[in-house]
Structure formats: C-alpha cells, structure tokens
Amino acid sequence: MTNKKAFKEACKFIAGGVNSPVRAFANVQSEPKFISHGKGAYIFDIDGNSYIDYVQSWGPLLFGHCDKDIQKACQKALHKGSSFGAPTLLETELAKLVLSDFPHLEKIRFVSSGTEATMSAIRLARGFTKKDKILKFEGCYHGHSDSLLVSAGSGAATFNSPSSLGVLEDVAKHTLVAKYNDINSVKELFEKNKDIACVIIEPIAGNMGLVPAKQDFLEELAKICKNNQTLLIFDEVMSGYRASYLGSYGINHIQADIITFGKVIGGGLPAAAFASRAEIMDILSPLGGVYQAGTLSGNPLAMAAGIASLTKAKKKTKLYDKLGKLAKKLTQGMKKLADEKGLPLQACHVGSMFGYFFTKDPVSNYQDALKSDLALFSKFHKNMLENGIYLAPSQFETGFICSKMDDKIIDTTLEAVRESFKRI
C-alpha cells in the first residue's frame, strides 16, 4: 500500500485520517507519510523512502528511534505485566530520579499525557489558592483541555473567547491571556484581576515555533506571582530534559511553584507528570480535596522507559553539549544559506530544540511569529521532504536533535537546505 492509498483508507475510519491534527500535513498543503519503522535518526515510510527525522515523535525521543537501552527496559517490564492499576516500585524510582535534581520540588504525580499534566496543575493551583482565574500567554500551547484552549481574541487585557468549538464561554471567561515576553501586559491583567490562581507559561515556547522567554521577563513574572499569592506554573512538557537536563531551570534557575513534565520523561511512551512542594501536592486526593486520577497513570511500561531515558541522559554528561552544538550548526547554517539566497529567515536553538521563521524581523512573541511567510515555509517543507529531510509540517512547531545525529547528518541536512532554497 502507498502513502496516498493509506491516507485515503485512514480517512474512511479515523476522523481526519489522523489522531492528532498536525499530522495530516494540511498546513503544508500535502498529505502525511505513513511510517513503517524508525532507527536512530531515521524514519522510513511505507513507500520505502527514508528520512532524517527532526520531529522525533514531537520531542520524546532524545535517544532517537529504537534505542536499545530503552527497548530493553520496556521488554523487561512487559515480561512482568503491562498494567496493574496498582502501585509499583518503578513509580517511586522515577519519582526519586526526577525530584533529586530539583531542590524546590518535593512531590510528584504521574499521568499519561501533557494535557493531563497541565489540566491537573491548573486544578491544583485553583484548589490551593481558592482563586478562579488563570493567566496564560498568547501562542503558548498547554494541551487541549477546555480552560487552556483560549487565544488572545480582542486583546490581552480582556476576557477571551474559545479557540475551539465545544469550549464554553463560561469556561473561557476565566482564562486571561497576556503577550509573551511583555511584562506590561501581565501587570495590566493583575491590576484589573485580583483572583488569579496561577500563571502558566512555556518558559521556552515551542508551539509558536521556538521562542524562548527572556530572562528579565521571567524574573519579573516570578516576582509578580509571589507578590500576588499566585502560583507560577512552568509548562516543561516539551522543554524538560530537552533544553538541558533540567529543562529551563538549568538555564534560567527560576523556581516555579509547579512544573509539568512530559515527552522525554516517558522515553517515547505515554507519560507525563506535575510536581511541586509538599504543601501544594498534599491537597491532592486521597490526602486532600483536589481530585485527579487515571487508569494508566504510572503504568510500568512508561515508568520503565522513563527511568531508562532519564538515567541515560544523566550519565552522559556531555550529551547536551553535543546536541546543542549540532543544533547551533544547523540553525547557523540555515541562516547563512538563506542570507546567500536573499531569503528572510530567523533561526535559533535552545539545547536540542531548534526553530526557524521565514521573516526578516526577530521573533519574540506570537504576533512576531505570525509574520512568517507561510507560503514560503510550505514550499521549503515540500522541498526538504523530497530531499529526505522530515521536518514538522507546521511553521508553529519546534524541531529536535537526537543523540544518534552527528556532524555528517547535519551536513547532509544543510545540503538539502541549499537545494531546497534553490527551488524556492
């Protein structure tokens, strides 16, 4: 069966033909590749084509596809049983592994997805502060729970409308939206609203393309939250163990009240978590009145994969230096080739994460990101795919370097960039 036929058949039985919208390739006016298998830095589609994979399952695969250590850990766990709905030693082992490197985090709760982690963190913050409103930032994505599917609408200083059908206005009205990297927009909202339970932010935004928050912005944000008895939530589902071993904390050293984790923490299996100090976490059921539960939360397969992934990352002390150097080489190379061709391009990286925009101006927030030439991006993406490079099929996603990549792979990629730019 070909990719084209596979997608046509999938559309008959699966809504939209995919189980997550961006996979449909609609943003690049194309159709998805159906993947048969992956190995290291590469994926292979059912037509027999191979690609250097910079999506890496949207971030979880720090060690690439089919890592032997993670596979071995999963096989060992599976041999004992895939799920019990009861505590296992693996849960405590992974909890200790995560918490040991974050002095301000004392307890953790595992869930099965980033959406569950952020949704639970919001509920926890509301339960702890006894306040109703939450503040998020334009362009930051925190999963698809109702209260977080809200955009800026008519402005940062107003209540906002849902950005998805099915999300009630009565839910959306409790979500405030500020401008990313703009502390004044945050101050305005706090001046007008005294019942903000929490501020949730991607300290390294990866869902409007890659846009890091500025250090002074985050420091001032933390002060505002503290002064208003508002909890600060860092959504590190994407950046955790990606930007550095300690995520954004390893870079900005800001101690958020709650951190959400995902992707790498599950080693490629469905796992996520939220963590905080004990006085906050202890109001979760069964100790307190904030309810959160999940049939597969902390399942042994995901815990085993997570332990293997984080243990390996922690042992390989030079891993993040290597990944950062490769990401830097890639983004600087792309920028140089774009300049030579006279194309507008902004490119950056943070650790093993990288992003690029087809615009001449620097990007520091969502409105800047929207200035990117989407038609140019679509042409570039198509050309790169034809040259064997698998990039995220959306301008507003982040790319990832994995440990199986090396200078040769980056050189091959940059040659593909050169050829792709020639055809634009």
Swiss-Prot record:
GO biological process: protoporphyrinogen IX biosynthetic process
Pathway: Porphyrin-containing compound metabolism; protoporphyrin-IX biosynthesis; 5-aminolevulinate from L-glutamyl-tRNA(Glu): step 2/2
Pfam families: Aminotran_3
EC number: 5.4.3.8
Necessary cofactors: pyridoxal 5'-phosphate
Residues bearing the modification N6-(pyridoxal phosphate)lysine: K263
Xref: PROSITE patterns: AA_TRANSFER_CLASS_3
UniProt KW keywords: Cytoplasm, Isomerase, Porphyrin biosynthesis, Pyridoxal phosphate
Compartments, as annotated in UniProt: Cytoplasm
Assembly: Homodimer.
Record-stated family: Belongs to the class-III pyridoxal-phosphate-dependent aminotransferase family. HemL subfamily.
Name of protein: Glutamate-1-semialdehyde 2,1-aminomutase
Native source species: Campylobacter jejuni subsp. jejuni serotype O:6 (strain 81116 / NCTC 11828)
